Amino acid sequence: MSFNTIIDWNSCTAEQQRQLLMRPAISASESITRTVNDILDNVKARGDEALREYSAKFDKTTVTALKVSAEEIAAASERLSDELKQAMAVAVKNIETFHTAQKLPPVDVETQPGVRCQQVTRPVASVGLYIPGGSAPLFSTVLMLATPARIAGCKKVVLCSPPPIADEILYAAQLCGVQDVFNVGGAQAIAALAFGTESVPKVDKIFGPGNAFVTEAKRQVSQRLDGAAIDMPAGPSEVLVIADSGATPDFVASDLLSQAEHGPDSQVILLTPAADMARRVAEAVERQLAELPRAETARQALNASRLIVTKDLAQCVEISNQYGPEHLIIQTRNARDLVDGITSAGSVFLGDWSLESAGDYASGTNHVLPTYGYTATCSSLGLADFQKRMTVQELSKEGFSALASTIETLAAAERLTAHKNAVTLRVNALKEQA
């Protein structure tokens, strides 16, 4: 189905509607699964030696020093323009402001007299950030990951990226307080972070996007007892736009294409109650496509994308919640009025001037978001992902005495005799003291 095909949602059967909201298939082939498993085992067994072999094989690079030196990072900084450095500084300031505001106050309550319960937070001790390489280095992801890690107080923050690492990535790492950067990419980088090597430290949790091999490596290490936790399940990027008749077609088209250019497996969807808006957006997409260097990539993504006309804005919200987009852009008059009805979305952008690019780079929200329908159960990345919660309880003699019979009754009902005995022993001790 062509992206220029305008679909009337209410003329479709329930099955056709379900098909319209299906995402491009993603599944690691058996060969990818096996290859990644072999890489993990090899890196775990042979450490740095295996990393160097994989760099030569996959990156066509001979890596002498896996760890990037301070001199190399300083030199990279010198090569960047002041304009880019200033732009990064503005982005980091906004990311800091938003993520600092996410700090949770400690919980300290007395659930009944003499029974004190607390909840406190502690940072994840060590985290590893994976940043893909390639022709368009994702240095903005360094800002999005390293900044909350620093605010959370993670003691060890390291970064891996395929060699040669772009100057922008090295500077962003330094700017955000990353302690060590390593010349290693792909599934082998995930293995190094999960298991540790002579050079790369083992970390508790791994963050960051990547290709099918990286994604599969993260999945596998998260399921190994000796592996590491990961940030969230990954899938192709996506955006859904809700637009009314007052939206600007060129704005809508530019936001759709911003997502489509990410990759051929990206998906974009327009929902609008105005058929004329759908037609004008389709025309604007074609005009803007002609000017894009990544037009072919975007065009492939558009093959799995949709222009859907609905009954009204309420139905747009209903369909959006069913789909659960990574990015949801609401270009309607009084866009904020629709927010209370949104139940599943990674990040929401309100109004004509809240373009997705702002969230991707510099508004302050995090651009690491659940995709592929995981918005139903997962949240956008935030400070909490770099922290863990811990509870504390303290019972006084009086508090224990008041709760003792309740605990005994519950333990006896579950036939956990040792649990009940732990109470009874203390009750008897108090009687003896009296």
UniProtKB/Swiss-Prot annotation:
Cofactor: Zn(2+)
Assigned keywords, A-Z: Amino-acid biosynthesis, Histidine biosynthesis, Metal-binding, NAD, Oxidoreductase, Zinc
GO CC annotations, alphabetized: cytosol
Pfam families documented for this protein: Histidinol_dh (PF00815)
Catalytic site positions: E326, H327
Family annotation (PROSITE patterns): HISOL_DEHYDROGENASE
Keyword rRNA-binding: no
Protein EC: 1.1.1.23
Textual note on the cofactor: Binds 1 zinc ion per subunit.
Single GO biological process annotation from the record: L-histidine biosynthetic process
Gene Ontology MF terms: histidinol dehydrogenase activity; NAD binding; zinc ion binding
NCBIfam families xref list: hisD
Family according to the record: Belongs to the histidinol dehydrogenase family.
Name listed for the protein in its UniProt record: Histidinol dehydrogenase
Species whose genome carries this gene: Shigella boydii serotype 4 (strain Sb227)
Top-level taxonomy: Bacteria, Pseudomonadati, Pseudomonadota, Gammaproteobacteria, Enterobacterales
Gene: hisD
